[in-house]
Amino acid sequence: MLSSLKNPRQAAAQLLNFGLILSTAFMMWKGLSVITDSPSPIVVVLSGSMEPAFQRGDLLFLWNRNLLRETDVGEVVVYNVKDKDIPIVHRIVRKFGAGASAKLLTKGDNNAADDTELYARGQDYLERQDIIGSVVAYIPFVGYVTILLSEHPWLKTVMLGIMGLVVVLQRE
C-alpha cells in the first residue's frame, strides 16, 4: 500500500490532488457567499433557543437580502454581535422604523426574554447591517457533525488523518 509513495512523481500527484479538492471546496464556499451576499451562507444551529422551529444541529441556508429591502417581523435571521465570533439564529419580534435605518429586536422562540442582553454593550437594537442573512431553507440534524467536531477535538484529528490516508493510498 505504501509502495506508491516510493515514486516521487506519484506522491506529488496525490498531494496536488488533495490540494485540488481543498481549493475546489474553498472556491465553492466563496462562490456561494457571493451569490447569497452573505459572508456565511450556511450555518449550524448550536443551541435549543429556536426550538421547535429549528433543533440543535440543523443546517440553515441563508440569503442576505439587499440592504434596501425591508426585513420583516417574524423573519428568522442570523446575526453577529460585535466582538463575538458565534452567529446567533433568532426571530425578529419587533421593528422600529423602516428601511436601512430600522431598529430590530430579536428573540429565540424557546427563550423567555428578548436578545437585548446578547447585544454588544450600549447596543439596544440590531441594525440591518448586523444581519448576516435570513433563513430560507434547512436540513434537519445534518450539521450535528460540526457540533461533535467542536465538542470533541480529537475527532477532527482522526477524520483529517483518515482523509489524508485515503488520498495518499488511492490509486488512479
From Swiss-Prot:
SUPFAM superfamilies, per database record: LexA/Signal peptidase
Main location: endoplasmic reticulum
Region named C-terminal short (CTS) helix: 158-169
Active-site residues, as the UniProt record annotates them: S49, H90, D115
Gene Ontology biological process terms, A to Z: signal peptide processing
EC number assigned by the record: 3.4.21.89
Sequence ranges on the Lumenal membrane side: 36-172
Protein name listed in UniProt: Signal peptidase complex catalytic subunit SEC11
Keywords: Endoplasmic reticulum, Hydrolase, Membrane, Protease, Signal-anchor, Transmembrane, Transmembrane helix
Taxon lineage: Eukaryota, Fungi, Dikarya, Ascomycota, Pezizomycotina
Primary gene name: SEC11
